[in-house]
């Protein structure tokens, strides 16, 4: 018998969904029944259903910072989404809503506020995304990942919790990872991750220096859907994947170094695993600049080296990898000196307190 019911929401990208999944086991241990509200065709639908969590779908319009003719119709989708969410909340009667952001979350948060249901939200990046900015007035508490984020949260709603880490990430097997990749030589391993869709510029840079890199390293390259290079399928010491799921914990634990974009959820997983990282954040041309802030924060803490996209010319990436290798012990020592409580426990504590008020 459950003590409480929480309805989670968040979607649009995997980064708005996977942290929710990290919380589910602890929520259930604390007596919560867990259900989910997402969009009709977002990435969250498949992910949540694959984890056997009851799923409700609502209408949702995308929130854009740029001109698009859909900006005229999407507000009506948001209004319908509020109506859809209100109907679900009236029937389900949850004790609390937990929002991870993304455009689908806004109607749910507003509907919860109208029904006087407490809302706890979480922001992964250093500055709040548009969805969390719009949701903030209707939230009881907004959990943040970076200490620097607290200054952006009004009305004393901000709580520093860090980023929830999926338990399975911490229990990968290096031996299994090496088996998956089929590496024959004993070399240090670099894992390259270009985000869920891959990164052409990172892929091209790595492959352009591949023969040089393979002298000293084995390479695991998660290159994104449609980005496999058929000419490199049987290249010794080089294993490429379009996308990985169940294998990811093993591959991450196999890696000695990680080259990656700077999404907050991912880099905190690397930190939890004590993996020295070279971060190549999305440029301001392709984003709101949040990854640049994330990367620089980790650089300042001594957890990472940073190489901006516009610096990816000639031998800069190769030289930065050599610098990462030479600073391996220093970076790991900085990570080991980190003062960090269990983020999942902190977030669940905030959720419980929001109910008991």
Curated annotation (Swiss-Prot):
Please verify whether the record's keywords include DNA damage. no
Biological process (GO) annotations?
carbohydrate metabolic process; cell division; cell wall organization; lipid glycosylation; peptidoglycan biosynthetic process; regulation of cell shape
Q: Which reaction does it catalyse?
A: di-trans,octa-cis-undecaprenyl diphospho-N-acetyl-alpha-D-muramoyl-L-alanyl-D-glutamyl-meso-2,6-diaminopimeloyl-D-alanyl-D-alanine + UDP-N-acetyl-alpha-D-glucosamine = di-trans,octa-cis-undecaprenyl diphospho-[N-acetyl-alpha-D-glucosaminyl-(1->4)]-N-acetyl-alpha-D-muramoyl-L-alanyl-D-glutamyl-meso-2,6-diaminopimeloyl-D-alanyl-D-alanine + UDP + H(+)
**What Gene Ontology molecular-function terms does this entry list?**
UDP-N-acetyl-D-glucosamine:N-acetylmuramoyl-L-alanyl-D-glutamyl-meso-2,6-diaminopimelyl-D-alanyl-D-alanine-diphosphoundecaprenol 4-beta-N-acetylglucosaminlytransferase activity; undecaprenyldiphospho-muramoylpentapeptide beta-N-acetylglucosaminyltransferase activity
What InterPro entries does the annotation carry? Answer: GlcNAc_MurG, Glyco_trans_28_C, GlycoTrans_28_N
Q: Where in the cell is it found?
A: Cell membrane
Annotated positions binding UDP-N-acetyl-alpha-D-glucosamine = 13-15, 166, 196, 291
E.C. code: 2.4.1.227
Give, as one word, the top-level EC class.
transferase
Protein's pathway: Cell wall biogenesis; peptidoglycan biosynthesis
One GO CC term on file:
plasma membrane
Give the membrane topology: Peripheral membrane protein
The main location class comes to membrane
UniProt keyword annotations, A-Z = Cell cycle, Cell division, Cell membrane, Cell shape, Cell wall biogenesis/degradation, Glycosyltransferase, Membrane, Peptidoglycan synthesis, Transferase
Its function, per the record, reads: Cell wall formation. Catalyzes the transfer of a GlcNAc subunit on undecaprenyl-pyrophosphoryl-MurNAc-pentapeptide (lipid intermediate I) to form undecaprenyl-pyrophosphoryl-MurNAc-(pentapeptide)GlcNAc (lipid intermediate II).
Q: Which family does it belong to?
A: Belongs to the glycosyltransferase 28 family. MurG subfamily.
Q: Which PANTHER family match?
A: UDP-N-ACETYLGLUCOSAMINE--N-ACETYLMURAMYL-(PENTAPEPTIDE) PYROPHOSPHORYL-UNDECAPRENOL N-ACETYLGLUCOSAMINE TRANSFERASE, UDP-N-ACETYLGLUCOSAMINE--N-ACETYLMURAMYL-(PENTAPEPTIDE) PYROPHOSPHORYL-UNDECAPRENOL N-ACETYLGLUCOSAMINE TRANSFERASE 1
Question: What is this protein called in UniProt?
Answer: UDP-N-acetylglucosamine--N-acetylmuramyl-(pentapeptide) pyrophosphoryl-undecaprenol N-acetylglucosamine transferase
């Amino acid at each position: 018998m459950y003590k409480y019911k929480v309805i989670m929401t968040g979607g649009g990208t995997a980064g708005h969904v996977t942290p929710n999944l990290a919380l589910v086991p602890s929520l259930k241990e604390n007596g919560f029944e867990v259900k989910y509200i997402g969009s009709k065709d977002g990435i969250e639908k498949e992910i949540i259903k694959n984890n056997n969590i009851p799923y409700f779908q609502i209408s949702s319009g995308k929130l854009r910072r740029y001109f698009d003719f859909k900006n005229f119709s999407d507000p009506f989708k948001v209004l319908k989404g509020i109506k859809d969410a209100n109907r679900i909340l009236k029937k389900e009667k949850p004790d609390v809503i937990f929002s991870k952001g993304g455009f689908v979350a806004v109607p749910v948060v507003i509907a919860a506020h109208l029904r006087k249901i407490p809302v706890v939200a979480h922001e992964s990046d250093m500055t709040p995304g548009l969805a969390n900015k719009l949701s903030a007035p209707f939230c009881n508490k907004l959990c943040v990942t970076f200490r620097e984020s607290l200054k952006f949260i009004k009305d004393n709603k901000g709580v520093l919790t860090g980023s929830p880490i999926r338990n399975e990430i911490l229990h990968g097997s290096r031996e299994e990872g090496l088996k998956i990749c089929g590496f024959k030589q004993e070399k240090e391993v670099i894992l390259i991750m270009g985000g869920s869709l891959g990164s052409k510029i990172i892929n091209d840079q790595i492959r352009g220096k591949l023969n040089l890199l393979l002298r000293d390293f084995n390479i695991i390259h998660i290159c994104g859907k449609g980005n496999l290079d058929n000419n490199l399928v049987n290249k010794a010491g080089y294993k490429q994947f379009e996308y990985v799921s169940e294998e990811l914990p093993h591959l991450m634990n196999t890696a000695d170094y990680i080259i990656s974009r700077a999404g907050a959820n991912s880099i905190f997983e690397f930190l939890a695993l004590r993996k020295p990282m070279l971060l190549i954040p999305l440029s301001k041309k392709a984003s709101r600049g949040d990854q640049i802030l994330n990367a620089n924060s980790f650089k300042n803490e001594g957890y990472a080296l940073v190489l901006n996209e516009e610096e990816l010319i000639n031998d800069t990436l190769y030289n930065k990898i050599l610098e990462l290798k030479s600073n391996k012990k220093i970076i790991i020592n900085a990570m080991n000196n980190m003062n960090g409580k269990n983020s999942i426990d902190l977030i669940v504590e905030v959720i419980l307190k929001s109910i008991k008020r």
